Amino acid sequence: MKTPWKVLLGLLGIAALVTVITVPVVLLNKGTDDAAADSRRTYTLTDYLKSTFRVKFYTLQWISDHEYLYKQENNILLFNAEYGNSSIFLENSTFDELGYSTNDYSVSPDRQFILFEYNYVKQWRHSYTASYDIYDLNKRQLITEERIPNNTQWITWSPVGHKLAYVWNNDIYVKNEPNLSSQRITWTGKENVIYNGVTDWVYEEEVFSAYSALWWSPNGTFLAYAQFNDTEVPLIEYSFYSDESLQYPKTVRIPYPKAGAENPTVKFFVVDTRTLSPNASVTSYQIVPPASVLIGDHYLCGVTWVTEERISLQWIRRAQNYSIIDICDYDESTGRWISSVARQHIEISTTGWVGRFRPAEPHFTSDGNSFYKIISNEEGYKHICHFQTDKSNCTFITKGAWEVIGIEALTSDYLYYISNEHKGMPGGRNLYRIQLNDYTKVTCLSCELNPERCQYYSASFSNKAKYYQLRCFGPGLPLYTLHSSSSDKELRVLEDNSALDKMLQDVQMPSKKLDVINLHGTKFWYQMILPPHFDKSKKYPLLIEVYAGPCSQKVDTVFRLSWATYLASTENIIVASFDGRGSGYQGDKIMHAINRRLGTFEVEDQIEATRQFSKMGFVDDKRIAIWGWSYGGYVTSMVLGAGSGVFKCGIAVAPVSKWEYYDSVYTERYMGLPTPEDNLDYYRNSTVMSRAENFKQVEYLLIHGTADDNVHFQQSAQLSKALVDAGVDFQTMWYTDEDHGIASNMAHQHIYTHMSHFLKQCFSLP
C-alpha cells in the first residue's frame, strides 16, 4: 500500500501550524489545475486490487562492515559498500538446478554454506514451517547427508562459523557441522502444550513479535532458549472448512489466553554447546526470574547477549507496569549463570504501562559495562537514558517534547537513533547521531538530504556501523541510498523508483494534507487525502479511516497506494484520519489517557474531530462515513453505536466487540483484569453490544474471516446476535477460512470491491 502524496498545509484556508515542504508536483496533477481540462485517467479500484503500480524496494543483507548481499534477477550479488563494485555470490542457475522454488536463503557467517528455504507453510502472523537444504559453496553442491527434517519451525546459523540450531516438533536441535547428525537439546516438546525454542500464540503475537525463542551468544559458544508451558491455557476452537469435498470441517485448536484467563508459564535456559557430543547427555542451565516478578504471573519480554559470558534478561509482571532487567554472568567453575541485585534495573510506570508495547531493549557498550535504553523521562516523553550495569540511576542523553523511536546503532564514539523531533511532526522520522562524550553534539543525518521528498526514514547499518542504508518512505516516492558513517556522504542511490514516477505522471493522483486541530485544549494531528483538483468551495463526502488503538499512529508522511487512493482519485471522496487521545509518539500524557478505559476517549475524539471536519466548509455533512479494521473496527463500531448523529454509515472489519474475548497480554496491558477487585466495570461498559440499539440510526457493514486466530469470529458473531436481538437492520459478510488479514487473492479483491459498493451506495455515488 503505497501512495504518491503531496503534503499540503494550510491549503484549505486553515492556519498551518508547522511547515511541511511539498513533494515535487510531478507526482501530482501535472499540467493543469483545471479538472475539466485534465484528460489523464484516475487511479482505479482495479489499479489497487491488481497492483498496477508497484513500488520497488531495495532489501539488502549486511554480511560484514563493508559488504552486503542483494538478490537481483535471481542472482545473489555481493556488493562492496566502499567501492560500489559487485560480484556474483551465487548464480541464478544454482536455483534452477534445485528442482524447487525457494522462498528465502541464508548464508552462514563464514560464507561456506547457504541455507535454502522451501515448502513454506504459513501458520500465524510470524510463524511458519518450511523445508531446508544446505548448499556447500566450496563444493558447489547440496549436502545430502543428515538432512534437516521437513516442517521445521525455525532455524538459525550461529553468529560465527556455521553451526545451526533449529526447532522441529517443538524441540531444539543443534548441528555442529552441516553434514553431521544433529544433537537433540530438548525432549519435552509437545504440540499445543510445551514449546521449546519457539513461541506459543500469545508470545508470538504480543510479546516478541516473532516465532523464534532461540538466542546464540556472540561467538556461538552458548545457545539460550525459552520454554513455554501452555498446559493450563484454555483453547480457542474454530472450524476450518477447507475444500468442499471435506464432509466434516476440521477443528483448529489453539492455546489462547483471554483476559483474566490462565497464562502460559515461561522458563529460560542456556546450553554450553562445547559440551555437545553424540554420546553425552545435554545439560541446560535454568536462569530463574528475579523474586520481584517471580512472586506472581509474569512474562519474559527481552533477551540480549551482552558479551560471550554475560546475558541480559528482561522480565515484566502480568500487569505490565513493572519490568526488570537482570544481567547474569557465567561462572566457568560451576557452569552456572549468576545474577546480582546490583545488576538489576527496574522500570515502573505510574500512569499506564511500561514501554510502548513492551519495554525497550537495552543496547550495551562493547565492554558490557553500560547500556542505553529508551524509557519515559519525567515529562513523559520516550528518550534515551545511559545506565551503568552496576548502578540503578541513569543519565538521559536526549530530551524534548518529542520522542526517540528506536536506537539504530552504537559505536565507541556515537549512538545513532530515529526520532520524530524534526519540525515538531510526530508523524515524521529522521536519523540522528549523538556524540557520546558530549551529549550536546547531535546531528540530524537525514533532515536536509531531500526535505521535499523524504520526511519518514528508517536505517540499516553494517555490522560495525561503518556504512548505512537510508530508506525514505515518503511523502514522495520511496528512495534508497547508501552512506558512509565517517563522512555522512551519500555514496550512491540504490533505488529511486524513477520508473514508477514516470508512470504516475499519466494519472490524476490525490494530495495529502497534514494539520492540527484543538481538542480539550490540546493540539492533535490529522491528515486528509484530497481528490485531484480539490476545490474548497465544493462539498465532498468524507470517510474517516480509523485505528486509534493504544500507541497507534495513522497520521504520518509515508507514501502509500491504497484503497484510499482510489476513493479520493476516482470517487472524489475525502479520506481523513486523526490521532487523538491514546495515540503514540507524542508523550505518555496523550498515550496513557485511555489507560484502564478502552472505548472511551479514543472513541469520543474521533467523533469530535469529525464534527470539526464537517464545519470546514468543504465536507458534505450528510455524507460522512467511518471504517476500520481490528481495533479500528472496534472504534468504528463504538463510534456508530454512540448515537452522535454525525455519521451516516460505517464498515467494521474483524472488530473486537468485547475485551474479555481478546488475548490477555494485549488487553490487560491497557485494561487490567476483568475482576470486581480490578477493572470489571470498564470491561462491561466498553462492549459494542451494549450500544446495539443506536445502530438503528446508521447503515452498518460488519465483516469477519471465519478462521481469524487473532480477533476470533466469536467477536462478530456475538455482536451480530446483539444487533439482531435489538431489531437492527444491518449488512454482514464473512470470509470462509480467512484469517485476520483476509489476504488471500480472491478474498482481498472481494472485500474491497464489496466495501466500495457499500460506500458508494451510502454516499449515493454512481
Curated annotation (Swiss-Prot):
This is Dipeptidyl peptidase 4. Residues 1-6 are cytoplasmic. Keywords: Aminopeptidase, Cell adhesion, Cell junction, Cell membrane, Cell projection, Disulfide bond, Glycoprotein, Hydrolase, Membrane, Protease, Secreted, Serine protease, Signal-anchor, Transmembrane, Transmembrane helix. It comes from Sus scrofa (Pig). It is an enzyme of class 3 (hydrolase). Belongs to the peptidase S9B family. DPPIV subfamily. The soluble form (Dipeptidyl peptidase 4 soluble form also named SDPP) derives from the membrane form (Dipeptidyl peptidase 4 membrane form also named MDPP) by proteolytic processing. N- and O-Glycosylated. It catalyses: Release of an N-terminal dipeptide, Xaa-Yaa-|-Zaa-, from a polypeptide, preferentially when Yaa is Pro, provided Zaa is neither Pro nor hydroxyproline. The lineage of its organism: Eukaryota, Metazoa, Chordata, Craniata, Vertebrata. Inhibited by GPC3 and diprotin A. InterPro entries: AB_hydrolase_fold, DPPIV_rep, Pept_S9_AS, Peptidase_S9_cat, Peptidase_S9B_N, Serine_Prot_S9B/DPPIV. The active site is at 630 (charge relay system), 708 (charge relay system), 740 (charge relay system). GO terms for cellular component: apical plasma membrane; cell surface; endocytic vesicle; extracellular region; intercellular canaliculus; lamellipodium; lamellipodium membrane; membrane raft.
